[in-house]
């Protein structure tokens, strides 16, 4: 205890790991002033505000070298995503694979990928919510042992949600409701039962989480109902800007202190708009109702939560808190639209090019932010130096590649992976279409 506040002793490099925060012109070189051998009181510790699983799991990778430990934790988070997405891809039908790939790429480029590979609980929240929705969606369409295997993947994904954030636990309920409205039929009673149990667990964990308790205990009698209504209307007007934060607009990497060039979020929004129009090619009352329900949660939760005294307004409520639901919404929205699509090679080319540009620019800016800091240009704002190797002030100790080389290889790898995925998905033999006339067992539940 120090002056009545509880602290824990942590390595100095961990306590000062964000020494450049809110100073875009500073690189991460400031961490060199501190040592792994020295300890310092830190107020950032497990006080019950977040679920135990995420931090207890990552504690397994904590070692004397803080930088190496952070590397191991990031790699573990990416591996978890690859295992879950890989399992869903292998077990699902071709049409489902296309929908899942499209929804994930658009929802996660660029900010989702940044958070998934981070040391933040949002990594598990984004991975868990989307993989849960995708596995449940694929499971409802699968048959035989693949069907049960996908339900198992859904359970594992829900576990990630439970152990990451309280709101992610609640998102299991939102995703379940959306996917079941879209696809559930009478023959899906076992799946409905599993989803209901997982959703009930999620709601129960959310209500008992430290985040919910903290929000409820932060009420202040001086905040009147009129004040809360005013803030709610302000939040409603700010909602489009908040949604644009999903692609990095005013809500970039770091602690929202790394501004992406304006054209990156704009291009990402163009791609998102393209997918919205693509999904509108095929509509049904189920799809409309499921989309409205998930979108309502994405809009309603931030508006209601981001009020005094928990938050001054929606501007203080990070977009990453709601980002996990974007992938589920897009998955619902593009369902039954991809197979009806008649996209040309030119349209696919623009899709790959635009996403590749967004990914490359976001990576370049983020690397520059920590390697040498951003440059302030009057009347323009913060920009990243073009040459990442020009003034290397900090870089990963065990990284043999230079910043520029790593950026080039990662950007090229993203483009090649995206191109290959589209080629394979387009040229695989199309499965025999299912009759559009519902049988008795396919009637709505």
Q: Over which residues does each language-model region extend?
A:
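Interfacial juxtamembrane loops and adjacent helix segments
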Residues: 1-67
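Membrane-lumen/periplasm interface segments of multi-pass, membrane-embedded glycan/lipid transferases
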Residues: 57, 206-280, 388-411
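Transmembrane-helix motifs of polytopic, lipid-linked glycan transferases
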Residues: 72-96
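Transmembrane-helix signature of polytopic, membrane-embedded enzymes
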Residues: 89-110
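Short acidic/glycine- and proline-prone juxtamembrane loop motifs at membrane-interface regions
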Residues: 117-125
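Perimembrane helix-loop-helix junctions
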Residues: 138-141, 169-199
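Membrane-interface alpha helices of multi-pass inner-membrane proteins
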Residues: 150-166, 171-177
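Transmembrane helical bundles and short interhelical boundary loops of multi-pass, membrane-embedded
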Residues: 182-185, 203, 215-228, 347-445
